[in-house]
Design a protein with these regions (language model features):
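Short Pro/Gly-enriched beta-strand edge/turn motifs at strand-loop
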Residues: 33-35, 100-103, 129-133
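Glycine-rich beta-alpha junction loops
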Residues: 22-24, 42-44, 72-76, 101-102, ...
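A generic structural signal for short beta-strands and their flanking turns/coil linkers
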Residues: 14-18, 34-36, 47-51, 66-68, ...
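ATP/nucleoside-binding phosphotransfer catalytic cores, i.e., glycine-rich phosphate-binding loops
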Residues: 40, 56-59, 107-191
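Short beta-strand-to-turn element immediately C-terminal to the catalytic PLP-Schiff-base lysine
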Residues: 23, 40-41, 54-56, 71, ...
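Catalytic core of DAGKc-family lipid kinases
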Residues: 1-66
Length: 191
């Protein structure tokens, strides 16, 4: 592996990242980034968190939920996937919003364009705190009325892969997908 790296025998991919800015009472309380996902989650197990999502300054929905996942295509096969989100191919530039265990009729994942500005606000007068996590790192607590804004970062992450296998092959291997269906090769011609 080291020899291949030294010989530059690898494939380089630029992966989209997210810029995450949290504010409360008009002042910035956190600025960071994420390669996979940023999440806003409830701090206390016994309560739901009331969150409002806005896209480009327009309200989308308010949910009583355990939180939301905001993911890149790289993160679409991680926490966002486990929460019910779709797989997004890594060469697609998009931002994915996935509510976590939302109590609402409209609680479906939403795929946004890469230049969208996504905001998530902890509804004022809500009991309890939200917590922002970036790629599994606890970033900041969000009191009621605080919000995060998430946009595509101008700085991608460059990844070196030793395999030039197409994403489909890597996806099948990662999730051990059955490419022959649940009945195996039962549909092949048996003549």
């Amino acid at each position: 592996t080291v020899d291949r790296m030294l010989a530059r025998d690898y494939v380089v991919e630029d992966r989209m990242t997210l810029e995450v800015v949290a504010t409360h009472a008009g002042r910035e309380i956190f600025r960071g980034w994420a390669l996979n996902e940023a999440t806003v989650e409830k701090a206390a197990r016994e309560r739901m968190l009331e969150l409002t999502a806005e896209i480009d300054g327009r309200p989308l929905s308010t949910w009583g939920c355990d939180g939301v996942v905001i993911a890149t295509p790289t993160g679409s096969t991680a926490y966002a996937f486990s929460a019910g989100g779709p797989v997004i191919w890594p060469d697609v530039e998009a931002i994915l919003l996935v509510p976590i265990s939302a109590h609402a009729l409209f609680a479906r994942p939403v795929v946004l364009g890469p230049r969208s500005r996504l905001a998530v606000e902890v509804v004022p007068h809500t009991d309890g705190l939200g917590v922002v996590w970036c790629d599994g790192r606890r970033a900041v607590d969000l009191p009621p009325g605080a919000r995060i804004e998430v946009t595509q970062s101008a700085i991608p992450v460059r990844l070196a892969r030793l395999s030039d296998a197409p994403f489909t092959d890597r996806l099948v291997a990662k999730f051990d997908l059955s490419v022959h269906g649940w009945r195996g090769r039962a549909r092949e011609d048996r003549s």
